[in-house]
Amino acid sequence: MKNPALLEEIKTYKGRDEVPEDFDAFWDEEIKKVSSLPAYQLEERDFHIPQVNCYELTFEGTNEGKVYARVVLPKSEEKVPLIFHFHGYMGRGWDWADMLAFTVAGYGVVSMDVRGQSGYSQDGLRSPLGNTVKGHIIRGAVEGREHLFYKDVYLDIYQLVEIIASLPQVDEKRLSSYGASQGGALALVAAALNPRIQKTVAIYPFLSDFRRVLEIGNTSEAYDELFRYFKFHDPFHETEEEIMATLAYIDVKNLAHRIQGEVKMITGLDDDVCYPITQFAIYNRLTCDKAYRIMPEYAHEAMNVFVNDQVYNWLCGSEIPFKYVR
């Protein structure tokens, strides 16, 4: 396996900065603010698919954001287990057809559009209509932790889980989360903020170890806004400590210790967007049941060879083999 030095380093690496002392108190207080079940609309859509019921869910998130999600539930007399899917940065939730694969195994699926990105969720007070990308990572970092864009997204996810868990068709004790890149980060956030999530699959998770990202000089599209903030707003890095201290409250590695359910992670060793070292800053802070798989030849790209089967097995308990069956 190539790059043995990196493989050795990632076994123990936990990130450049420690968790703020009041981190859990901050998030517990933020969750308390949204602990009441929000008003929501769940509208059924008839797509002439006889085996499932399809719904569009909308609710008001923090700071007047409007959150939209697609919901697919297999028709069943029993309560169904459910998977929350989260999409990549600047993207949108799954198409309806993408969600149907899991219903064959008896699982419901919810796919949320992140506010202000390419789907139907809206960014509220910041921009009531349309796409507000880019700048989501850095937004609010100058004003303070209460103003962070991703703080609102994380609370949207908490509320989403609460709404879905309250539905009579859903088995609230069998909830999972799944995603890649930003989606992998948000799947972990779902489990960290809401212990109802019992199982998480994260593929090359984003939003981790911001200090290391800055030191690496990551100018990929995903992290470009962090680089550009310092290049064009603070070239002497006079505010670096304050910015890093604020971003610590949305750093996924700092949420890892809160996760109680099982976690599986997949990493491409050639990833130059969400560097493997930053992903393992999350993994090595997990205290729950966990496992990972590394793909040495893969970068931050579609992982279509056996990975979808592996994820399906992890989430649904199936036993699809990882070889060509003749």
Q: Can you describe what each PLM-predicted range is?
A:
Residues 1-52, 324-326:
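N-terminal targeting or regulatory segments adjacent to alpha/beta-hydrolase or S9 domains
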Residues 33-77:
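N-terminal cap/lid segment of alpha/beta-hydrolase-fold proteins
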Residues 94, 100-103, 107-155:
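Cap/lid segment of the alpha/beta-hydrolase catalytic domain
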Residues 136-181:
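Gly/Ser-rich "nucleophile elbow"/oxyanion-hole loop immediately N-terminal to the catalytic nucleophile
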Residues 189-237, 294:
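Hydrolase active-site cap/lid region
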Residues 258-259, 265-267:
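Short beta-strand/loop motif that positions the catalytic acidic residue
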Residues 269-274, 301:
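Acidic catalytic loop of the alpha/beta-hydrolase fold
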Residues 294-312:
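Histidine-bearing beta->alpha loop at or near hydrolase active sites
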